[in-house]
A protein has these predicted regions:
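Substrate-binding pocket helix/loop in short-chain dehydrogenase/reductase
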Residues: 99-100, 107-112, 207
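Conserved glycine-rich cofactor-binding loop
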Residues: 16-17
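Residue(s) in the substrate-gating loop at a strand-loop-helix junction
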Residues: 144
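Alpha-helical segment proximal to the catalytic Tyr-Lys
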Residues: 128, 173-177, 234
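C-terminal substrate-recognition "lid" of short-chain dehydrogenase/reductases
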Residues: 215-243
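Catalytic Tyr-x(3-8)-Lys segment
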Residues: 201-220
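Active-site helix of classical SDR
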Residues: 123, 160
């Protein structure tokens, strides 16, 4: 039996690739409608073509950092277009691989904007009953195990993910009395376009052999994200769930 119906409308960011793509496709497979957001519209439309029910995969082309100062206005415009939302999965993100000594302020701010401020502003705004369905609404953000693994060269990236975990756990406590839930999922190494590019070779070298089950696939994470968005996890909120294979 499907987890959702077409009355359940979800927002998924970063839906054109990686974990966001598999989350969006899985939600549609489980019966929901998905407003899929990404900066690359061409890639997003190609994902729609893969969908089992393309009519339930709704494409929105946006750079979320451009809406930081008025996230409320942006989400209200989506609600007016599609209706109230049952949940949101924030899967958009970027990585910055540099030693701390070479890291510049501006690039650090840019990374915090997409990895921290955008999800925090989006999720705290989403929890407005004028935008979400109220009690039972669920938000999940993809963080990272790097928040506590603290690999060399990932100073700012690790900081964005640790901050995200902490802030969303706080928001979860604030919205729990209204029956709303907020969680994060922190994967270790997953084979996505972001983590498997040439810039990440120095991190990956010799690392996969330390993974008892090898590097994960995006689908290994999306199953957990979809579970946390569903009513099957109705008692779970305010926590970070590690997606890993006994690596640490």
């Amino acid at each position: 039996m499907a987890l959702f119906t077409e009355e359940n409308i979800f927002i998924v960011t970063g839906a054109s690739s990686g974990i966001g793509k598999t989350v969006a496709l899985k939600l549609v497979e489980e019966g929901a409608k998905v407003v899929s957001i990404a900066r690359n519209l061409e890639r997003l439309q190609s994902v729609k073509a893969e969908c089992v029910k393309p009519e339930c995969f709704l494409c929105e082309n946006a750079d979320l950092t451009e809406h930081l100062s008025d996230m409320s206005g942006y989400l209200k415009s989506l609600k007016e277009k599609y209706g109230k939302f049952s949940g949101i999965a924030y899967c958009a993100g970027q990585i910055l691989l540099k030693p701390a000594s070479a890291t510049e302020y501006e690039e650090s701010v840019n990374l915090f904007n997409i990895n921290y401020f955008a999800p925090v502003m989006m999720i705290k705004t989403f929890m407005d009953k004028r935008i979400c369905t109220g009690g039972g609404a669920s938000a999940v953000a993809v963080a990272s195990a790097e928040a506590f693994l603290r690999e060399k060269g990932l100073c700012i990236y690790s900081g964005t993910k640790a901050a995200l975990q902490a802030s969303l756990a706080t928001i979860a406590k604030e919205v729990a009395p209204r029956g709303m839930r907020v969680n994060t999922v922190s994967p270790s190494d997953i084979k996505t376009p972001m983590t498997m590019n040439e810039d990440m070779i120095s991190i990956r070298q010799g690392r996969e052999e330390t993974y008892p089950l090898g590097f994960g696939e995006p689908g290994d994470v999306s199953e957990l994200v979809v579970f946390l968005l569903s009513n099957k996890s109705k008692w779970l909120t305010g926590h970070d769930y590690i997606a890993d294979c006994a690596t640490f």
